[in-house]
Amino acid sequence: MAIHSIEPERRTLHGHFSRDLPPCLTINSGDTVVFRTLDARWTVGLSVSGKWDTNAPQFSPLNPELDSGHALCGPVAIRGAKPGMTLEIQIKDIVPGSWGWTFAGGWPHDVNRRLNLVDSPTLLSWSIDSEAMTATNQHGHRVQLRPFMGVMGMPTDEPGILSTAPPRATGGNLDCKELVAGTRLFLPVAVESGLF
């Protein structure tokens, strides 16, 4: 069984799901893929302040039509995967980068309205210690980490561009904090080769 790597570059990144996306990699069942990912906002570094903020540099070039969702790596085609089959994803490890961010409020969303956070956004910039698995924000608050991938999935057999925001039967924006290192995710395959 082979080990493959995917780095974030134009040919491996997309901001939507689609059955029409060409795979950036084709693997055999049982192979391992190491993904190096960007954050949800396509951020590639910190601001000049040394912290993450809304001025942090983003991946470029972005296509407004195709890259409006989360920064996804792939898709990966699995030889022999066919609609009606189940894909097992084994999450062997998740190693966070050296920084991260938390952003809440600042736009009219149902949750923000209920919490009265529509007008005033709150931004926390985190320095991450991946060995100690802790993160410390700009206010000195430290939290223990248990990293998980927010978005994992494959396209449905629908034509066109599908948003990364909603979860679907084939995966997507699951935000399942239980999907940590050592766990497995089972998803139904809807298109030829899966395109994970």
Q: Where in this protein do the model-derived segments appear?
A:
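N-terminal, Lys/Arg-enriched amphipathic/low-complexity engagement segments
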Residues: 1-64
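Short, structured beta-strand/loop micro-motifs enriched in basic residues and often containing a Trp
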Residues: 8-18, 65-73, 162-170
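Short, conserved secondary-structure segments in the cores of folded domains
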Residues: 13, 21-23, 72-77, 175
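A generic structural signal for residues embedded in beta-strands
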Residues: 35, 86-89, 187
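Short, Lys/Arg- and Gly-enriched loop/turn segments at beta-strand edges
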Residues: 40-52, 94-104, 193-196
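Intrinsically disordered, low-complexity linker/loop segments enriched in Gly/Pro
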Residues: 70, 93-181, 186
